[in-house]
Amino acid sequence: MNTCIQLLILCLVTVINSENSTDHSTENTIENETEDVTKTELLKTIENETENVIETELPETVETEIQTEALNLPQSPEQRYCRSKGQYCSRTYFHRCCGNLVCQLHGFFNGTCVDCLAERKFCIWSSECCSGRCRLFRCRKNTHVKVIHY
């Protein structure tokens, strides 16, 4: 609401300035009109204009963007800072992955949430790797494979 008032005042000032620079004969009428306008009249006109806005006037892209963003929102308050699978993560508290997902980094504090890390991806703990083995900050192939004979 305050921004609407500021925009309306800014428009009035620009109209006054443009009229003053182009035509000096209308200077007195513009000043009289601006003096007659009170703050309550400005508020009433802004309220009337905002009431006339219909939902169908919004572009379809805005509506679909709002729907897709609503799907990506965390469902509970404790998931406020965590991201779901495929979303951006940075391995920080504010951009961490939810649940058992891990952050696969593509750059410095730039990654994507995945189920587990593939071979030769940056890791800190063995639980992050699909193979279950993290060695020297890289996921390694699990060489300890149990062979079960039937």
UniProtKB/Swiss-Prot annotation:
Domain of life of the native organism: Eukaryota
GO terms for cellular component: extracellular region
Keywords attached to this entry: Disulfide bond, Glycoprotein, Knottin, Secreted, Signal
The keyword Cytoplasm is annotated on this UniProt entry: no
Pfam assignment, any one: UPF0506
Subcellular location: Secreted
Glycosylation-annotated residues: 20, 32, 48, 110
TM region(s), chain numbering: none
Disulfide bond positions: 116-130, 123-134, 129-139
Signal peptide residues on this chain, from the entry's feature table: 1-18
Coiled-coil regions listed: none
Domain notes: The presence of a 'disulfide through disulfide knot' structurally defines this protein as a knottin.
Family the entry assigns: Belongs to the UPF0506 family.
Protein name, as recorded: UPF0506 protein SJCHGC09643
Biological source species: Schistosoma japonicum (Blood fluke)
Record lineage: Eukaryota, Metazoa, Spiralia, Lophotrochozoa, Platyhelminthes
